[in-house]
Amino acid sequence: HGVVRHVGTQYMADVSRDALVVSVREGQVEIDGRFHQGRAREGQQVTLSGSQQPSILSIDRSGREWAWVARRTPAADVDGKTLHEFLVWACRETGLRLQFEGNAEAVARDTVLRGRIDAEPAEALRLRLATTALKWRIEEGVIHITDETR
């Protein structure tokens, strides 16, 4: 069906006898098909099927179909790094967007982490945040971090 080249990304490709399906979580993927060429961007799923025009759908960046990423992600070595750095890592690995509210970003940048948690990113996120003064919730693919002390 074609050649797929990623450009600094997280993506998955599924090839069957009838189609090539490329889903992009982060970054972009160049697709060079037999009949069509193009680029799939973050949050898109492109399907090439023979000489038909490519089909482009919007997709979520997190969820069941991306669970394999978390299973393959090594534990983050965050000893001596900030909570902010950890949150950026965890969001990338889970496909969530990060949104700070109130003074939470300053707290995250000032909080230095110690130790290591050998867990998948979502579980590491839950365990790390349980030890901080920050509250968090996930809504529609966004993790909202708020300062509990306010």
Which residues does each PLM region occupy?
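A residue-level detector for the "anchor" residue at the start of short, highly conserved motifs
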Residues: 1-150
